[in-house]
């Protein structure tokens, strides 16, 4: 049976962690000096006027490299807990992790052979 008093610490932590950022924003809004002027209403207020067009079109190659990086980065995040408990889990989990690693590697080899990672 669920006993709600078991979660008192969780609810207290949730309420306190919600109140602290709200109080920080309220206090900074009250104590911050009001600085109004034409510089504050411009879209670029560092004092240097931007030159040229702000819209730049990126090459699709950047997105391909970013996508490959994100895939392997997320895979690393999932493999870290497995590596920390490798001695406890056994061989079956090792085979599952090996398959988990091989699937993105097959995708990387496919992208490499199709020329998706070529820079020229």
Curated annotation (Swiss-Prot):
Xref: Pfam families: Oxidored_q4
Give the main localization category: plastid
GO MF terms on file? NADH dehydrogenase (ubiquinone) activity; quinone binding
UniProt keyword terms in alphabetical order: Chloroplast, Membrane, NAD, NADP, Plastid, Plastoquinone, Quinone, Thylakoid, Translocase, Transmembrane, Transmembrane helix, Transport
Catalytic activity from the UniProt record = a plastoquinone + NADH + (n+1) H(+)(in) = a plastoquinol + NAD(+) + n H(+)(out); a plastoquinone + NADPH + (n+1) H(+)(in) = a plastoquinol + NADP(+) + n H(+)(out)
Spans traversing the lipid bilayer? 9-29, 64-84, 88-108
Q: What class of enzyme is it?
A: translocase
Instruction: State the function annotated in the UniProt record.
Output: NDH shuttles electrons from NAD(P)H:plastoquinone, via FMN and iron-sulfur (Fe-S) centers, to quinones in the photosynthetic chain and possibly in a chloroplast respiratory chain. The immediate electron acceptor for the enzyme in this species is believed to be plastoquinone. Couples the redox reaction to proton translocation, and thus conserves the redox energy in a proton gradient.
**Protein's name according to its UniProt entry:** NAD(P)H-quinone oxidoreductase subunit 3, chloroplastic
Query: What is the species listed in this Swiss-Prot or TrEMBL entry?
Result: Ceratophyllum demersum
Give the organism's phylogenetic lineage. Answer: Eukaryota, Viridiplantae, Streptophyta, Embryophyta, Tracheophyta
